[in-house]
């Protein structure tokens, strides 16, 4: 059963889906260059918004992608999904909510919800990244220090 407080870090449990998760909101202002001829945010920009939210989440946990690279770990994208529900427009203030629902293994899966300032859901998405040794370019398990960071930030759903 899930603990009522923060998740306790235990490698043997990291395959389990917890009732708890990590969520983080990132605000993004739509620039004119992000829009297409129809005046909508071009679909490709949502992938960039996901990346910005991931980087912001990592920094909020006390770790940057540059820190990970210095520790010899890189995280390439393995899979991306994006579902467009409503358009966003120039100068909209978007909230990109990132959710981490599962403890990572050799891969980590992030989910995204993009809202406009009226709270309307515009887009949902998912990215799956792998953990790779930067020197050998070979897959590896999630490092213990990364699992501990995630476990320390785990919150009730």
What role is predicted for each listed range?
Residues 57-95, 99-103, 107-109, 122:
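Hydrophobic beta-strand-centered segment that forms part of the acyl-chain substrate-binding groove
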Residues 20-60, 117:
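Catalytic strand-loop segment that frames the active site of acyl-thioester-processing enzymes
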Residues 28-32, 84, 131:
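Hydrophobic residues in beta-strands and at strand termini
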Residues 22-26, 59, 89-90, 101-157:
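HotDog/MaoC-like acyl-thioester-processing domains
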Residues 39, 98, 137:
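Hydrophobic pocket/interface hotspot
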Residues 1-20:
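N-terminal amphipathic/basic-hydrophobic helices that include classical n-h-c signal peptides
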Residues 10-12, 32, 152:
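Generic cytosolic/nucleocytoplasmic N-terminal low-complexity/intrinsically disordered segments
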Residues 46-49, 74-76, 111, 128:
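Residue-level recognition of specific faces of alpha-helices
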